[in-house]
Structure formats: structure tokens, C-alpha cells
A protein has these predicted regions:
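Structural signature of beta-strand start/N-cap positions in the alpha/beta core
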Residues: 3, 28, 61-64, 87, ...
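Short, Asp-centered acidic motifs that coordinate Mg2+ and/or phosphate
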Residues: 31, 64, 144
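N-terminal Rossmann-like dinucleotide-binding module
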Residues: 1-44
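Predominantly a Rossmann-like dinucleotide-binding segment in NAD(P)-dependent oxidoreductases
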Residues: 122-162
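Beta-loop-alpha module in the N-terminal Rossmann-like domain of NAD(P)-dependent dehydrogenases
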Residues: 47-107
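Acidic-histidine catalytic/liganding microenvironments
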Residues: 24, 44, 59-60, 124
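Rossmann-fold dehydrogenase core element
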Residues: 103-120, 141-145
């Protein structure tokens, strides 16, 4: 059984990660970092909920840490998890700069741990189709591709991430 700690319990955690973690029998979501323990316990009554990753890692020996927090926290939280000998799956963007990313890759290698960036749409049909068209040369010599995706909403909401 792979003991898993989920950092954050918002849209990404509950939509992209938790369904897989709950479905696959080799994973057990034992610890969650969230500011809303009542929301977590309604979905995962067996999970222990903490307000900080530092606090949870002092108490629990987990195998995997899944990071679904705001972007600026990804790097520091991945580092902390690796320093506690955990495998890490982190939402995109991995880090805010390449130096931090390279340091984390080196740390993971030195700890002999897996460090993976999660791209939730990597294997979606639309992206696979574009990849195939490019590989087949049907779109010519592409120099740049710009793509926008707004969750199928005709009008974007007024939020800091959007």
C-alpha cells in the first residue's frame, strides 16, 4: 500500500487526483493538508487533516506527497517532501524558475525518489491529435504554438488565476 499525503483539497485535488487515488487499490490517502477539515472529512472520513505540510511530515511517514497548492508553493513543498524521503507528484507549473527546478531534480536523484510534474491534459484527444498532425508534417514547419483553454466557459470569471 502506498501511503499518500495530499497537499491541498481544492478543484485540482478533488477532480484530477483523488478519483485516481481512490480508484487504484495500491494507494491510500491517509493525510490531507487543508484549511477546511470538515470538507475533507466529508469525503475522506479516515484521513487525518493538518494545516501545514511541515506539521504532517513530522508526525506521518508517507510514501507519496501529491502537491495541488498555489503555484508559488510548489517548489518549497516539493523540497520539503523530498527532504522527508517522499516521492513527489506536483501540479504544473513545477516551479517558478529553472534554477529551483534543477535543484529539486538533483535532490530527488540524491534521495533516489520519483519526482513527477502532473499535466492533467497531456493525453487528451485534442492534444494527441495536434501532436500526431505535427509528427506527420501536416501542419508544416511550426515555429510557435499558442493555445488558450478556459474550462469551457464563454466568459472568464474575475479571479486571480484566470
Amino acid at each position: 500500500m502506498i501511503s499518500t499525503l495530499l497537499v491541498g483539497f481544492g478543484f485540482s485535488a478533488t477532480t484530477f487526483h483523488l478519483p485516481f487515488l481512490n480508484y487504484l487499490p495500491q494507494f491510500s490517502v491517509d493525510v490531507v493538508i487543508s484549511s477546511k477539515p470538515d470538507v475533507v472529512n466529508a469525503v475522506l472520513p479516515h484521513a487525518e487533516v493538518y494545516g501545514s505540510l511541515e506539521e504532517a511530515l513530522k508526525i506521518h511517514d508517507v510514501d507519496l506527497v501529491v502537491i495541488t497548492t498555489p503555484n508559488h508553493l510548489h517548489g518549497p513543498q516539493a523540497k520539503l517532501a523530498l527532504e522527508h524521503s517522499c516521492h513527489v507528484l506536483v501540479e504544473k507549473p513545477f516551479t517558478l524558475d529553472s534554477e529551483e527546478a534543477e535543484a529539486l531534480v538533483e535532490l530527488a536523484h540524491s534521495q533516489n525518489k520519483q519526482l513527477c510534474v502532473y499535466h492533467n491534459r497531456r493525453f487528451d484527444g485534442d492534444f494527441l491529435t495536434i501532436k500526431q498532425l505535427i509528427n506527420d508534417g501536416k501542419l508544416g514547419d511550426i515555429k510557435r504554438l499558442e493555445s488558450r483553454f478556459d474550462r469551457f466557459r464563454p466568459v472568464p470569471r474575475d479571479r486571480w488565476r484566470e
